[in-house]
């Protein structure tokens, strides 16, 4: 009798530990990976409403990591944000430039990139994003709209001549059509910002990839995406039901013992 009670007590303790661990992981995912801002050059400490966000950054106005001023600067050539010159190989086509503006808005404003934030040791930022699963249609359209524009590099994070205060092509770096340096949409989106993005096989609306473009009237679809990946990273995603199944098995053992 005493042995049976000891066994039952041990089973109960195991059940409590398992369920407790699962709840801890879920809580960690919610606080550390969701609704957060990067520790970077222009980001706010915490996301919040910004009613006057400018033009292409407006989809994030209900909950943003960027200020109104940052959103305005995101639309300018050689803005104070990073002194980056989109027209380094002649005038960039407006259809192409709008993708880079949207890319900047997503980077500066989105509070839904937590699952992909990584620490870095750089003078201008302490954190970056890595391998954000960008919806394939957003990447394909970006590449298509930039086919007629020119550039001189495949990695825009490094290798520029900054002596004039903004980026210019390095000596010997020839200006070529985008498709010369970016032969496919995947190369463009994965390589241009040193793997900040990783093109997803999922489509817009799937809940499994980050949308650069969305209609705020329909809500922010990237919130669901962030929750999915945060849960998966915390070990509480598709396996969230296993504590219950284990507890059920333990209870059966208890009854049969």
From Swiss-Prot:
Key words of the record: Cell membrane, Cytoplasmic vesicle, Disulfide bond, Endosome, Folate-binding, Glycoprotein, GPI-anchor, Lipoprotein, Membrane, Neurodegeneration, Receptor, Secreted, Signal, Transport
Annotated propeptide span(s): 235-257
GO molecular function: folic acid binding; folic acid receptor activity; signaling receptor activity
Effect of residue 107 to A: Moderately reduced affinity for folate
Keyword hit for Nucleus: no
Leader peptide range in chain numbering: 1-24
Compartments in which it is found: Cell membrane; Apical cell membrane; Basolateral cell membrane; Secreted
Impact after mutating residue 124 to A: Moderately reduced affinity for folate
Tissues in which the UniProt entry reports expression: Primarily expressed in tissues of epithelial origin. Expression is increased in malignant tissues. Expressed in kidney, lung and cerebellum. Detected in placenta and thymus epithelium.
Residues with attached carbohydrate: 69, 161, 201
Any one GO BP annotation for this protein: heart looping
Posttranslational mods: The secreted form is derived from the membrane-bound form either by cleavage of the GPI anchor, or/and by proteolysis catalyzed by a metalloprotease.
Main location: membrane
Residue ranges that the Swiss-Prot or TrEMBL entry lists as coiled coil: none
Example of a GO cellular component annotation carried by this entry: brush border membrane
Outcome of substituting residue 162 to A: Moderately reduced affinity for folate
Purpose: Binds to folate and reduced folic acid derivatives and mediates delivery of 5-methyltetrahydrofolate and folate analogs into the interior of cells. Has high affinity for folate and folic acid analogs at neutral pH. Exposure to slightly acidic pH after receptor endocytosis triggers a conformation change that strongly reduces its affinity for folates and mediates their release. Required for normal embryonic development and normal cell proliferation.
UniProt disease link: Neurodegeneration due to cerebral folate transport deficiency: An autosomal recessive neurodegenerative disorder resulting from brain-specific folate deficiency early in life. Onset is apparent in late infancy with severe developmental regression, movement disturbances, epilepsy and leukodystrophy.
Protein name from the UniProt record: Folate receptor alpha
Species of provenance: Homo sapiens (Human)
Gene: FOLR1
């Amino acid at each position: 009798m005493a042995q049976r009670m000891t066994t039952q007590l041990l089973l109960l303790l195991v059940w409590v530990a398992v369920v407790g661990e699962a709840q801890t992981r879920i809580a960690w995912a919610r606080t550390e990976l969701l609704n957060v801002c990067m520790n970077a050059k222009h980001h706010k400490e915490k996301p919040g409403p910004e009613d006057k966000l400018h033009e292409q950054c407006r989809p994030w106005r209900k909950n943003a990591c960027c200020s109104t001023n940052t959103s305005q600067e995101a639309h300018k050539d050689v803005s104070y944000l990073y002194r980056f010159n989109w027209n380094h190989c002649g005038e960039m086509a407006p259809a192409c430039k709008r993708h880079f503006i949207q890319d900047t808005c997503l980077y500066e404003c989105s509070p839904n990139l937590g699952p992909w934030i990584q620490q870095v040791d750089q003078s201008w930022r302490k954190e970056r994003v890595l391998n954000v699963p960008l919806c394939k249609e957003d990447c394909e359209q970006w590449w298509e709209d930039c086919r007629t524009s020119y550039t001189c590099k495949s990695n825009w994070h490094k290798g520029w001549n900054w002596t004039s205060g903004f980026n210019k092509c390095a000596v010997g770096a020839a200006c070529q059509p985008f498709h010369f340096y970016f032969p496919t949409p995947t190369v463009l989106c994965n390589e241009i910002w040193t793997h900040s993005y990783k093109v997803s096989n999922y489509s817009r609306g799937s809940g499994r990839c980050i949308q650069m473009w969305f209609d705020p009237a329909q809500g922010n679809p990237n919130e669901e995406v962030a929750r999915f990946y945060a849960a998966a990273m915390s070990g509480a995603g598709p396996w969230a039901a296993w504590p219950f199944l284990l507890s059920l098995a333990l209870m059966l053992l208890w009854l049969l013992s």
